Amino acid sequence: MDDWIDYYDSTHTIYVSKLHRDVHFRVIANDILAYVPSPSAVVLDYSCGEALFAAGVAAACQKLILAEPAPGVRGRLTARFGPNPKIEVRSLDELQPLPNGSVDLAVMISVAQYMTPAELDRAFSLMRRILKPGGKLVLGDILRPEVGAATDVAALLKLAAKNGFLTDALWGLARTALSDYWQLRQSIGLQRYGEAEMIAKLKAAGFSPSRAKTNVGYNPARMTFVATVPDLADKKPETA
């Protein structure tokens, strides 16, 4: 994951324009809002990126923790949201002191593809510990093995046409093809998971998971999973 952290901490070309970046984060924020369980909830956004519209998510909950591994991005988050008393910015290492069962909702959106399977397992273990019984982990934008880059390009162009940055998207795709992003994608690769594989991975971490009907974000070819921490208090005792 370190190489990808360095990439996103640089002046990268993953977004074809400012409008693309804004639309991307607005779509994700709106989708996250649908999962916030109550105004009293504590929400964690793991590897949140720029999280431009996090203030809207924070307004719907009691506390929003933005956890980001890239130091430069984390600095911008602190500058952007520092005055907001409902938002707390942390590094990933700073999540370790969080008490057991202190979070109602955790989201990991478009993150798993940049992590090794072992790194993802460690993140799941952390989430399982800090989520309350009945709390949920929303794992979004999971790449499927059978879906290639052409599908991602088509999803981007559809989003661009809908939101008025199609020309920028076409030029941006040409630039990105020659950028460090594609070099990294070809040399390191992106992690992909089938539905059954991810369900098994989440079950092994102690969750009760299922695939959501729709993906978080704008790419319907990718998958979102909702993994619930079992509430043992609600489990009916077995009868003889």
PLM region spans:
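Conserved beta-strand/loop positions that form the S-adenosyl-L-methionine
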Residues: 46
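Structural signature of beta-strand start/N-cap positions in the alpha/beta core
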Residues: 42, 63, 102-104
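Helix-capping/helix-break motifs at membrane-protein junctions
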Residues: 116-117
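A short glycine-rich, Lys/Arg-flanked "PGG" loop and its adjoining helix->strand segment in the class I
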Residues: 121-133
